[in-house]
């Protein structure tokens, strides 16, 4: 899948950073540091995007875990190119329904180029109602705003 370069105006970048600061303040008031789990499927670009996501999460005050059960935020960064990636992601989403039942405040996000494909996004939204957020790489820069909206609407 071809990547498109977008120039983000400084005012929009500043707005996203303000969301990071607000979330960091919310998280600083918690008795324990909240944790995030980021799982990457696919190519080197996905690895780079996952690092950006981890950077945002760090700015928001999250630590990291390799256990989905411990995480307040789970991010699955998907790939539409690699063989069997779609089946693996959908299988893992099915398993996460049990985790979400035990931790209903947990935020589950699916992003990446697979999530950008309309038929896949529709399938996730219809079949995996425990998923809170589905977005493609073209709006990755708005991740702090998406998380802020989810946190403040609960």
Indicate where each model-derived feature is located:
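Cofactor-cradling patches in redox/metallo enzymes
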Residues: 1-146
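The C-terminal output helix
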Residues: 148-154
């Amino acid at each position: 899948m071809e990547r498109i370069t977008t120039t983000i105006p400084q005012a929009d970048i500043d707005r996203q950073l303000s969301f990071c600061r607000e979330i960091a303040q919310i998280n600083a008031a918690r008795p324990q540091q909240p944790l995030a789990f980021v799982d990457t499927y696919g190519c080197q670009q996905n690895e780079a995007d996952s690092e950006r996501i981890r950077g945002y999460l760090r700015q928001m005050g999250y630590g990291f875990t390799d256990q989905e059960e411990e995480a307040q935020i789970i991010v699955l960064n998907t790939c539409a190119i690699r063989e069997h990636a779609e089946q693996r992601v959908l299988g893992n989403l099915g398993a996460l329904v049990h985790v979400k039942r035990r931790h209903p405040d947990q935020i589950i996000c699916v992003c990446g180029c697979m999530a950008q494909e309309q038929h896949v996004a529709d399938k996730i939204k219809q079949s995996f109602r425990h998923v809170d957020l589905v977005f493609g790489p073209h709006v990755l820069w708005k991740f702090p705003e998406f998380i802020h909206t989810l946190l403040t609407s609960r």
